[in-house]
């Protein structure tokens, strides 16, 4: 009868012998266990048979190759074979996995420790941060990082309490997909210590933002919360000013699209991160401030309720908030739409009958019109997202699509100051061009301006500096830039709308209603013919000459006259506007893949 030897595969200590002499064993069954470097290694039978000798006992030390036991080869009846353990895939999990499952339950909104607070939040009309994140991402695509972290307060609170009351240390972070594309999220959980910034949730942000930079992922930040948390005790911290989260997040500006959502109270550090975002969305009941009520009172500046500090009635007209949403449901939908503009063309699009454009600018040159109607007709139906609509209202800034292609848009608003560009409007337009250039969105400019705003009040706003930002920003941009003159194109204001010059754009075209001049016609007449007008004593005669001179300049500056002198590229049927824009954008080379590389150092927060 053949006899096989079983030898030690490694040097170690025998911690258990599982068979005895005369015992029947089957191939693959465990005979004994060796401990090597504090790890247990099973020694198994290579063939079936009967154990004929056992040469070691528990506690023995063996060298590699030492003989452990012998087995006489032979068939083992089915009923006598040592049966391997049967794995029950549907049975109860083993203890270590069960512990993980049990711990994960504390992260859910239906955890007993959270149910009451979740109900109270729902009663206020708000979703939880986890509900918002679930709504943001494609179904089942979100994977959380750092969910088992708890507040660093074990020196003052029981660990069990921290697990129940501070899940994820109040910061839900991870990666999912929006519209099929990977997106990162960092969401403060207001149900955990009022969404404050704890030691470990700072660590989680640091980790996430580093991964975001490495993978070039867009980021959505749910910023609701009260700022820094002084109650963490488990780390020796004096001021915590070495926290990297703010620097890491700011470094993403211009690298990847960043979206911030403020719902409810957003103060201090939470607000600082929000302000770093390319797009700031806030709900109607949000309050946003660099200092909350406690800081204000502590500074001896008065006592205020949270709702009195940075309400939307302040933060939207002053330009802090880009888009105001009715609630967090709409806020998440806006974030999804915003991210879609950076995901490439959409194959499905529709538009209004473009012949409507022929009738939206009145024939009478002094009659105002709603430029929003022009924008909505020109863009693909339902694709318009206007940014900062209550700030700098002399210029409309928006994102949209033309034949499915994402574009950025700036447009003078003739209903405000006749379309004149003031300081706020200039800042708003310059920042929007930066945003579009950073992420390679072509810019379409709809020009109808008498120029920049003039007068002592305008200059008191530091207009010289603000207005010049439009020139400097456009000169540094490399995205395709198309200017369409709807009516007025006068002076430096018109040049600024065209990126610095009518020949700085890829294409400058005008509708038949276009009128042009080096400055406003009325001002030009009063300046150039002042002496002649002053010499006429009869008011009617003076007015008649004035009207004649204005009419002469108007005729000279008509769109067809400008095209005749080739100061613009063409005068077109307004119904052809989309086609001409699409044609020139198609001729431009595609933007290179910039993942991991910035085109601009950052996108101005203002």
Regions found by a protein language model. Give the residues of each.
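Short histidine-centered loop motifs in beta-beta connectors
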Residues: 9, 16-24, 47-48, 52-57
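Short beta-strand-turn/beta-hairpin segments enriched in glycine/proline and small hydrophobics
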Residues: 1-14, 30-48, 249-251
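Short, compositionally biased
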Residues: 44-52, 75-92
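Short hydrophobic beta/alpha edge segments that flank linear recognition/processing sites
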Residues: 23-44, 63-80
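A contiguous, mid-protein "functional segment" used to position or interact
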Residues: 57-73, 576-586
């Amino acid at each position: 009868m053949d006899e096989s030897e079983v030898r030690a595969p490694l040097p170690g200590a025998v911690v258990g012998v599982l068979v005895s002499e005369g015992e029947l064993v089957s191939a693959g069954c465990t005979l004994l266990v060796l401990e090597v470097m504090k790890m247990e290694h099973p020694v198994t039978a290579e063939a079936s048979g009967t154990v004929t000798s056992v040469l070691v006992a528990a506690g023995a030390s063996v060298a590699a190759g030492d003989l452990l036991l012998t087995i006489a080869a032979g068939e083992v009846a089915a009923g006598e074979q040592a049966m391997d353990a049967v794995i029950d895939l549907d049975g109860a999990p083993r203890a270590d996995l069960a512990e993980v499952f049990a711990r994960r339950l504390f992260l859910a909104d239906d955890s007993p420790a959270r149910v009451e607070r979740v109900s109270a939040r729902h009663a206020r009309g708000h979703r939880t941060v986890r509900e918002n994140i679930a709504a943001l991402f494609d179904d089942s695509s979100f994977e959380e990082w750092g969910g088992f972290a708890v507040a660093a307060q074990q020196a003052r609170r029981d660990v069990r309490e921290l697990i129940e009351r501070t899940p994820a240390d109040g910061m839900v972070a991870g990666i999912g997909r929006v519209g099929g594309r990977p997106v990162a999220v960092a969401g403060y959980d207001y149900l955990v210590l009022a969404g404050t910034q704890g030691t470990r949730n700072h660590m989680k942000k640091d980790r996430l933002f580093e991964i975001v930079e490495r993978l070039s992922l867009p980021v959505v930040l749910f910023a609701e919360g009260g700022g820094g948390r002084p109650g963490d005790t488990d780390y020796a911290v004096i001021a915590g000013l070495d926290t990297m989260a703010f620097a890491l997040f700011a470094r993403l500006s211009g690298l990847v699209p960043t979206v911030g959502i403020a719902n409810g109270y957003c103060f201090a550090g939470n607000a600082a991160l929000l302000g770093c975002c390319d797009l700031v969305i806030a709900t109607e009941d949000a309050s946003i401030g660099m200092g909350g009520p406690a800081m204000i009172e502590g500074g001896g500046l008065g006592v205020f309720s949270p709702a009195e500090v940075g309400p939307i009635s302040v933060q939207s007209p002053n330009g802090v908030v880009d888009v105001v949403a009715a609630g967090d449901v709409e806020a998440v939908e806006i974030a999804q739409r915003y991210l879609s503009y950076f995901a490439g063309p959409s194959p499905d699009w529709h538009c209004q009958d473009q012949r409507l454009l022929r009738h939206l600018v009145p024939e009478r040159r002094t009659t105002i019109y709603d430029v929003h109607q022009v924008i909505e007709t020109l863009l693909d139906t339902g694709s318009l997202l206007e940014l900062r609509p209550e700030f700098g209202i002399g210029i409309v800034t928006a994102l949209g699509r033309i034949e499915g292609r994402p574009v950025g848009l700036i447009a003078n608003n003739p209903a405000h100051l006749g379309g004149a560009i003031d300081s706020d409007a200039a800042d708003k337009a310059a920042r929007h061009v930066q945003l579009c250039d950073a992420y390679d969105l072509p810019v379409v400019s709809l020009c109808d301006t008498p120029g920049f705003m003039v007068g002592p009040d305008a200059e008191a706003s530091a207009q010289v500096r603000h207005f010049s930002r439009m020139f400097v920003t456009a000169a540094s941009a490399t995205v395709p830039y198309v200017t369409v003159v709807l009516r007025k194109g006068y002076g430096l204001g018109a040049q600024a709308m065209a990126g610095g010059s009518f020949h700085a754009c890829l294409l400058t075209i005008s509708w038949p209603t276009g009128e042009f001049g080096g400055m406003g016609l009325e001002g030009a007449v009063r300046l150039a013919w002042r002496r002649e007008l002053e010499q006429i004593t009869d008011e009617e005669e003076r007015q008649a000459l004035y009207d004649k001179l204005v009419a002469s300049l108007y005729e000279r500056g008509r769109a067809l006259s400008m095209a005749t002198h080739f100061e613009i590229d063409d005068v077109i049927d307004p119904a052809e506007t989309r086609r001409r824009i699409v044609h020139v954008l198609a001729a431009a080379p595609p933007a290179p893949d910039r993942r991991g590389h910035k085109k601009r150092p950052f996108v101005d927060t203002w």
